Amino acid sequence: MAADIRIVPCLTDNFGYLIHDPSSGATASIDAPEAAPLIAALEKEGWKLTDILVTHHHGDHVGGVAELKKKYQCRVVAPHDANAKIADIDLRVEEGDVVRVGGLSARVLETPGHTLDHISYVFDDDRALFAADTLFSIGCGRVFEGTYPMMWESLLKLRELPDDFKLYCGHEYTASNVKFALTIEPDNAALQARAKQVEQQRAAGQPTIPVTLGEEKQANLFLRADVPSVAAAVGLPGESAADVFGELRERKNNS
């Protein structure tokens, strides 16, 4: 039976996510930006939280962990080298590990760059990628702890997933990401189409997530740093994809 996924807006622009296995009743929260909205969503659905799958240590992703752990006695899964900012870790995971949530299986990918401990969770059977702050729709996370080549390699790892996977990212940044991307690739038809879709979604008060990886591969600049036209657009024809990515990220930082 397919997983049920709920998007739970948290804080100012964070996404919390609940993924539920109808067969076993198990439910995981992907990160826990704050407890109250997640508790409300769980109670609305009649679900009991069994697991929290943490992607990285930033406070806007783990701020609700301690309260949820206390209330539900749930298991906290976190990156193997996560620091002390994450409370009460029960299981540390690394590349290639598989985390089971009832009958659901999540494969762990190490995706460092935004932070050194960042991981993503891949639910292959449910065609769902929870990439937190590594990959956004039409964007990517700032590189706080890693390097640009490191972040580029992480994005390449996610780009290898099939086109039909749906991306669930950490923040609602899509509108601003689209605005920036159009300054680099104004003639990208896939980006233009996504821009119209995002405008309609935001006007209706709807989230811009999920989106398929196939769409992102066509429209997201940060997944296309190895495309010659993108390199040329930032004045780096013939340079390495990592250097082009770094230039894109610097420009986005200053936009």
Swiss-Prot record:
Residue positions binding Zn(2+) 1: H56, H58, H114, D133
Cofactor or coenzyme needed: Zn(2+)
Pfam families per the UniProt record, alphabetical: HAGH_C (PF16123), Lactamase_B (PF00753)
Residues at which Zn(2+) 2 binds: D60, H61, D133, H171
Involved pathway(s): Secondary metabolite metabolism; methylglyoxal degradation; (R)-lactate from methylglyoxal: step 2/2
Gene Ontology MF annotations: hydroxyacylglutathione hydrolase activity; metal ion binding
Keywords: Hydrolase, Metal-binding, Zinc
Family matches, as Gene3D superfamilies: Ribonuclease Z/Hydroxyacylglutathione hydrolase-like (3.60.15.10)
Catalytic reaction list: an S-(2-hydroxyacyl)glutathione + H2O = a 2-hydroxy carboxylate + glutathione + H(+)
Broad class of enzyme this protein falls into: hydrolase
E.C. number: 3.1.2.6
An individual GO BP term: methylglyoxal catabolic process to D-lactate via S-lactoyl-glutathione
InterPro entries per record: Clx_II_MBL (IPR035680), Glyoxalase_II_hydrolase (IPR050110), HAGH_C (IPR032282), Hydroxyacylglutathione_Hdrlase (IPR017782), Metallo-B-lactamas (IPR001279), RibonucZ/Hydroxyglut_hydro (IPR036866)
Comment on bound cofactor: Binds 2 Zn(2+) ions per subunit.
Described purpose of this protein according to its UniProt entry: Thiolesterase that catalyzes the hydrolysis of S-D-lactoyl-glutathione to form glutathione and D-lactic acid.
Family: Belongs to the metallo-beta-lactamase superfamily. Glyoxalase II family.
HAMAP family hit by this protein: Glyoxalase_2
NCBIfam families registered for this protein in UniProt: GSH_gloB (TIGR03413)
Quaternary structure, from the entry: Monomer.
Name used for this protein in its record: Hydroxyacylglutathione hydrolase
Organism for this UniProt entry: Rhodopseudomonas palustris (strain BisB5)
